[in-house]
Amino acid sequence: MKSVKHILARKGSAVIAVPADTTVLNVLKLMAEKNIGSVVVTKNESYIGLVTERDYARKIILMGRHSDDTTAGDIITTNLPRITPNSTVDNCMLIMSESNIRYLPVFDDADKLCGIISINDVVYETIHSQKETIDQLHSYIHAT
């Protein structure tokens, strides 16, 4: 069964991070520039949460706030479930589905952030794994 470390090996473990006092407007510009849907928010260079496109929609647009005078720290999501590189892809899918979230922070044994995985990463890995199984079964059937 595939684990998060397989996802991180494929896509890399680099994360895009901003300090908590960064304006939401600058966070959005960074997300657009990097073509990503979430950004890690830090305080004193330590992880404190994520800002996502959903946070922007719910906490800025729907609340009538302005992205140029609101900080990332004002709208972060801080209570996300944590996973490790050894967490299974199936478990990540379950956590994301049950929590209705699209991103999970990955922490190592020293509680250091070592990556972010998205629902797209999980779906890609699941499809790739199923394709491998189908190819193996196909080879087995044609070998007999």
Predicted regions: what they are:
Residues 1-13, 52-82, 88-97, 119-144:
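Tandem CBS (Bateman) regulatory domains
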Residues 31-34, 39-55, 96, 104-120:
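A glycine-centered beta-loop-beta connector
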Residues 78-79, 102-113, 140-144:
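Short flexible/disordered coil segments
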Residues 15-16, 38-39, 48, 73, ...:
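Structural motif
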Residues 17-35, 42, 82-100, 107, ...:
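The conserved cystathionine-beta-synthase
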Residues 23, 48, 81, 111, ...:
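Glycine-/small-residue-rich active-site loops that bind phosphorylated ligands and cofactors
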Residues 9-39, 46-47, 56-59, 63:
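N-terminal first-folded block
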